[in-house]
UniProtKB/Swiss-Prot annotation:
Record field: catalytic activity: cytidine(1407) in 16S rRNA + S-adenosyl-L-methionine = 5-methylcytidine(1407) in 16S rRNA + S-adenosyl-L-homocysteine + H(+)
Protein name: Ribosomal RNA small subunit methyltransferase F
Family: Belongs to the class I-like SAM-binding methyltransferase superfamily. RsmB/NOP family.
EC id: 2.1.1.178
GO biological process: rRNA base methylation
Entry GO MF terms: RNA binding; rRNA (cytosine-C5-)-methyltransferase activity
Keywords recorded for this protein, A-Z: Cytoplasm, Methyltransferase, RNA-binding, rRNA processing, S-adenosyl-L-methionine, Transferase
Residues the entry annotates as binding S-adenosyl-L-methionine: 126-132, 150, 177, 195
Pfam families: Methyltr_RsmB-F, Methyltr_RsmF_N, Methyltranf_PUA, YebU_pre-PUA_dom
Alphabetized PANTHER family for the sequence: 28S RRNA (CYTOSINE(4447)-C(5))-METHYLTRANSFERASE-RELATED, NOP2 YEAST -RELATED NOL1/NOP2/FMU SUN DOMAIN-CONTAINING
Predominant subcellular localization, coarse grouping: cytoplasm
Subcellular location: Cytoplasm
Originating organism: Pectobacterium carotovorum subsp. carotovorum (strain PC1)
UniProt function note: Specifically methylates the cytosine at position 1407 (m5C1407) of 16S rRNA.
């Protein structure tokens, strides 16, 4: 593993931190925390495996796991060390059983569902690489719908890959500047997560170069963008809805001041809700307004800021956008065609709740769209909605990998459980020669009781059909990694 090089903290930045740091905290402790490597942390993906089953699974691996107090699915991995750079290639990760996610970044979603908030439609304004989107999907248990937006074109592909790997079925993706949503979908969402682009002062333990372009002038520019984003998000939020505003930075200009600015625009419609009781010991990071201002030395984590805001009344709408969305390219599958399609899918071991996911088509493509988003179709351009289920051919259907990962029954008659060695070959893109041979010709392949793909048996060979962009030459089991 590469040697950790502490960040060079500018004197002006340290002066700013000294001015805003609570008297209960020490600057010496702050500097010491910033110059320590960040603890590796993971989140169990409960769409694939329960926390209890995951802990039983990894118990033989010798992982030293410490629970993260604000996320019951989250754990610090205390003895990561050399395997830090290889956790992403473990079978357990490639199968979607866990997500490598910094502990502080689990806070916003925990705050979103604080007091067991019941949510139907959620917007994740800046979603890539997908840690929070997949965390929201798990908390929703794939019910309702999420719009996962990402402005950066280079990060959209990564976002989709993580959504697919984790078996998320209730998400639609958009590729916009987040400032469009308030006008395009006014007062539409039950909840919004705005993890805003920021100066990144809190991430120096993970990325020492994060401070290389730090300046007061850049913070002023970023804060102006953040005000635009939070204003648009507030307009897109239903009356009674909740918004989480978060950053991975520490200065007040990008944090408290942005929230107070929004409240000043809508004094009769915007309330702050305290996060003091979000988890045991949360009061150590709680401000007078009930925000969480997490300096890195408090919980030995990244620096972070989280605010929870409630929209208490409707607000005057923004002007409608001038652009044209264009004709929606999909149409619902006719009821008479749904029955044989559903029967064919079930025969293959693929099941879904027809009240949550609805069949749509485009040419020969069959898709499953979240029913909760139907009213948004045609009002905004989506880059991808739900799950591509199949392609229709004269002799039947070609079922898609992402549908199998999200919807297949690991206990179906045609399911075949892979050993560690065979699973490694599968994720390395190789054909497999298992013993004993499976009896079915079309197989749902599983690993640790979760579906990882669909394959054909040809004589004694399982033909590898894993999409090429998912192939990992270094795929290995976590147990094998622990032995090395």
């Amino acid at each position: 593993m590469a040697k950790f090089t502490p960040a060079n903290l500018p004197a002006e930045f340290l002066d700013t931190m000294r001015d805003i740091m609570p008297s209960s905290l020490s600057m010496d402790d702050f500097i010491a925390a910033c110059q320590r490597p960040l603890r590796r942390s993971i989140r169990v993906n409960t769409l694939k495996i329960s926390v209890e089953a995951f802990l039983r699974l990894v118990q033989p691996y010798g992982w030293q796991l410490e629970p993260i107090p604000w996320c019951q699915e989250g754990f610090w991995l205390l003895n990561a060390e050399e395997e830090n750079t290889r956790l992403g290639n473990t079978l357990e990760h490639l199968s979607g059983l866990f997500y490598i996610q910094e502990a502080s970044s689990m806070l916003p979603v925990s705050a979103l569902f604080h007091r067991n908030e019941a949510l139907e439609t959620v917007l994740d304004v800046a979603a890539a690489p997908g840690s929070k989107t997949t965390q929201i999907a798990a908390r929703l248990d794939n019910k309702g719908a999420i719009v996962a937006n990402e402005y950066s074109a280079s990060r959209v592909k990564v976002l989709h890959a993580n959504i697919s790997r984790c078996g998320v079925s209730n998400t639609a993706m958009t590729h916009f500047d987040g400032r469009v949503f308030g006008a395009a979908l006014p007062e539409y969402f039950d909840a919004i997560l705005l993890d805003a682009p920021c100066s990144g002062e809190g991430v120096v333990r993970k990325d020492p170069a994060a401070m290389s372009h730090w300046s007061p002038e850049s913070i002023t520019e970023i804060a102006a963008t953040q005000r635009d984003l939070i204003l648009s998000a507030f307009h897109a939020l239903k009356p009674g809805g909740v918004m989480i505003y978060s950053t991975c930075t520490l200065n007040k200009q990008e944090n408290q001041q942005v929230c107070h600015w929004l409240q000043a625009q809508f004094p009769d419609a915007c309330e702050f809700e305290s996060l003091r009781d979000l988890f045991t010991d949360a009061e150590r990071a709680t401000t007078e307004d009930g925000f969480l201002h997490v300096f890195p030395q408090i919980y030995d984590s990244e620096g972070f800021f989280v605010a929870r805001l409630r929209k208490t009344a409707s607000v005057p709408p923004l002007p409608r956008p001038g652009y044209k969305v264009g004709k929606f390219p999909f149409s619902p599958v006719a009821p008479k065609d749904c029955v044989p399609l559903i029967q064919a899918a079930r025969k293959q071991g693929i099941h879904w709740d027809e009240t949550l996911l609805q069949l749509w088509q485009r040419d020969s493509e069959i898709w499953l769209f979240p029913a909760a988003l139907a009213s948004a179709f045609g009002n905004i351009k989506f880059s991808r909605i739900g799950i591509k289920l199949a392609e229709r051919f004269p002799k039947g259907f070609r079922w898609q990998h992402e549908a199998v990962v999200a919807l297949a029954d690991p206990n179906a008659n045609n399911a075949y459980a892979l050993t560690d060695d065979i699973a490694c070959e599968w994720f390395q893109g190789k054909d497999c020669y298992p013993e004993p041979l499976p009896t079915a010709d079309e197989l749902i392949l599983t690993y640790q009781n979760t579906p990882v793909g669909l394959a054909k048996r040809i004589n004694s060979r399982i033909k590898n059909s894993l999409p090429r962009d998912l192939v990992r030459d270094g795929a290995s089991s976590a147990q094998q990694l622990a032995k090395e």
